[in-house]
Every structure is written in structure tokens, then in C-alpha cells.
Amino acid sequence: MAILRASEIREMSASELNDKLVEIKKELMKENSNKATGGAPSNPGKVKELKRTVARIKTIMNEKK
């Protein structure tokens, strides 16, 4: 998952934003379950970045309303 910048997110349509949000939430859930079962994360900063990306997408979706 590449880092999504706010400018890239703003260029997406509403349906693309919803699809991307679902995709990122699934990835975040997978990382959290891996952490909960005692596994070591492949990239420790990934969870933080995924959470920030979800927040960015939700913020921009709210701005477009």
C-alpha cells in the first residue's frame, strides 16, 4: 500500500474513495489481527500510516458533502 497524499485523494470520485477506504480498512484489520496473535509486524510504522490514511479519506469525503 503506497502512501496516499491528500491531493491524490481529492482527485478520486466518491465510489473510488469508498473502495479505497474498504481496502485500507481490510489491510488495517489484517495488521491488527497479526499483532494481536503475537506476530511481529513486517513494518512497524504501517499501522500508524494506515490509520492516518483512513482519517484523510474520511475527512475529504466529509469535505465533499
Swiss-Prot record:
NCBIfam families tied to this protein: L29
Cysteine disulfide links: none
UniProt entry tagged with the keyword Glycoprotein: no
Gene3D superfamilies given in the database record: 1.10.287.310
Name of this protein: Large ribosomal subunit protein uL29
Domain of life assignment: Archaea
Gene Ontology CC terms, in alphabetical order: ribonucleoprotein complex; ribosome
Gene (UniProt): rpl29
